[in-house]
Amino acid sequence: PEILKLTDIYGVRAGVIAVYPMYRGLARLVGMQVVKAGDTVADEFTALEKSFGQFDFFFVHIKKTDSYGEDGNFDGKMHVIEEVDRELPRLLALQPDVIVVTGDHSTPAACKAHSWHPVPVLLWSKWCRPDDAKGFSERECRFGGLGHIRAAELMPLMMGYAERLAKFGA
């Protein structure tokens, strides 16, 4: 079957920064260019900074949160999330139009496996309206302005908040 490219669908030049080969391969399949990065979260953010002007859209995948969840290593998973939190000011300094933080699935350390639990989504743009969420977690996201959305709705929302849609809705 023909697989459409992100450029054809959304008109964006897209880059991927990912340690895990499967994500790089899938990204290539949909027309994204792989940006070389080292193995650490800091390395991935450095690669993002260095290549920021070359792309309209980035997918940055942090694998260790998933790996630690599968191992049942709550502390390890927590430390990786804290590492991402420490690196976020570097992303904010680049002044992107939209930032999305989410996961491709839940991997609770207590389950030691991928699970059926909903995945929290944080979407930020200067066009976002304030909501009642006070943090970013599975529980706190129920107070967020996005509500419960399907994954297929995320890219059009991102494009809308980046002011890159010709029209939203019917």
Model features per residue range: what roles?
Residues P1-A170:
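Feature captures the catalytic ectodomains and active-site-proximal regions of enzymes
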